[in-house]
C-alpha cells in the first residue's frame, strides 16, 4: 500500500520501527479521529480477511496478486472468469480490444501458435472501487482500470499479467 520508495525504506526497518511507523500511518489515515474506530483500518482488515478467504492457494491470499489488488482497490465492478476456456472463451478472444494490442499479444501468444487455453480472470473497475493506500487514506479510483490474472500452471494460483494502472505489477 506504500509508494515504492517508502516500501523500500519500510522493509529496511526493524520490527519495532515498523510497528511505530504503522501505528503512526493508521493515525494519519483516520478520517474521524474523534471516534474510537479508524474506518480506513477497519476496511483494510475486512479486505485482508476477504482476500485470505478467497485467494489462499499456496500462501496467504493477502499476499497473492489477486489479494493485493483486492485489498488496494476493493471489489471490482466486473469480473470475467474462465476456469476452462474453450474456443471463443480464450483469453485473447475475451480481451478483444480492451487492452493495447501489444499487451494482448504478449499475454496470449503461445510458442507453438496454438490457442491459449490457460484459465484467467479479468477484473474491471469502473465506478465502485475505493483505493486504500493513496497517501494513507481512501480515495475514489480512476474509472476503467483493468487487471488480468492468468493461472499459468493450472494449480489455481493466478498471476497478475496486465494492469492498466501504474503501481501494480
Tell me the role of every PLM-derived stretch.
Residues 1-169:
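Residues within mature, well-folded domains
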Amino acid at each position: 500500500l506504500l509508494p515504492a520508495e517508502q516500501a523500500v525504506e519500510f522493509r529496511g526497518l526493524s520490527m519495532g520501527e515498523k510497528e511505530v511507523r504503522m501505528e503512526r500511518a493508521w493515525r494519519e489515515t483516520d478520517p474521524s479521529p474523534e471516534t474510537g474506530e479508524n474506518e480506513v483500518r477497519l476496511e483494510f482488515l475486512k479486505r485482508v480477511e476477504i482476500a485470505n478467504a478467497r485467494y489462499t492457494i499456496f500462501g496467504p491470499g493477502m499476499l497473492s496478486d489477486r489479494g493485493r489488488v483486492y485489498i488496494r482497490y476493493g471489489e471490482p465492478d466486473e469480473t470475467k472468469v474462465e476456469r476452462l476456456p474453450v474456443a471463443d472463451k480464450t483469453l485473447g478472444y475475451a480481451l478483444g480490444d480492451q487492452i493495447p494490442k501489444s499487451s494482448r499479444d504478449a499475454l496470449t501468444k503461445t510458442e507453438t501458435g496454438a490457442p491459449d487455453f490457460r484459465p484467467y480472470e479479468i477484473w474491471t473497475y469502473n465506478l465502485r472501487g475505493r483505493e486504500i493506500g493513496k497517501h494513507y487514506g481512501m480515495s475514489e479510483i480512476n474509472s476503467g482500470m483493468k487487471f488480468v490474472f492468468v493461472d499459468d500452471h493450472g494449480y489455481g494460483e493466478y498471476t497478475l499479467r496486465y494492469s492498466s494502472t501504474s503501481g501494480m505489477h
